[in-house]
């Protein structure tokens, strides 16, 4: 997914 927050490849997409 690509949400912008959370883990960078598990569920987030961004590192914020």
Swiss-Prot record:
<keyword id="KW-0175">Coiled coil</keyword>
<dbReference type="GO" id="GO:0002250">
    <property type="term" value="P:adaptive immune response"/>
</dbReference>
<comment type="subunit">
    <text>Heterohexamer; disulfide linked. Contains 2 sets of 3 non-identical chains (alpha, beta and gamma). The 2 heterotrimers are in head to head conformation with the N-termini in a small central domain.</text>
</comment>
<keyword id="KW-0094">Blood coagulation</keyword>
<keyword id="KW-0964">Secreted</keyword>
<keyword id="KW-0399">Innate immunity</keyword>
<keyword id="KW-0391">Immunity</keyword>
<protein>
    <recommendedName>
        <fullName>Fibrinogen alpha chain</fullName>
    </recommendedName>
</protein>
<dbReference type="GO" id="GO:0005576">
    <property type="term" value="C:extracellular region"/>
</dbReference>
<dbReference type="GO" id="GO:0045087">
    <property type="term" value="P:innate immune response"/>
</dbReference>
<keyword id="KW-0356">Hemostasis</keyword>
<comment type="function">
    <text>Cleaved by the protease thrombin to yield monomers which, together with fibrinogen beta (FGB) and fibrinogen gamma (FGG), polymerize to form an insoluble fibrin matrix. Fibrin has a major function in hemostasis as one of the primary components of blood clots. In addition, functions during the early stages of wound repair to stabilize the lesion and guide cell migration during re-epithelialization. Was originally thought to be essential for platelet aggregation, based on in vitro studies using anticoagulated blood.</text>
</comment>
<dbReference type="GO" id="GO:0007596">
    <property type="term" value="P:blood coagulation"/>
</dbReference>
<keyword id="KW-1064">Adaptive immunity</keyword>
<keyword id="KW-1015">Disulfide bond</keyword>
């Amino acid at each position: 997914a690509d949400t912008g927050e959370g883990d960078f490849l598990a569920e987030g997409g961004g590192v914020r």
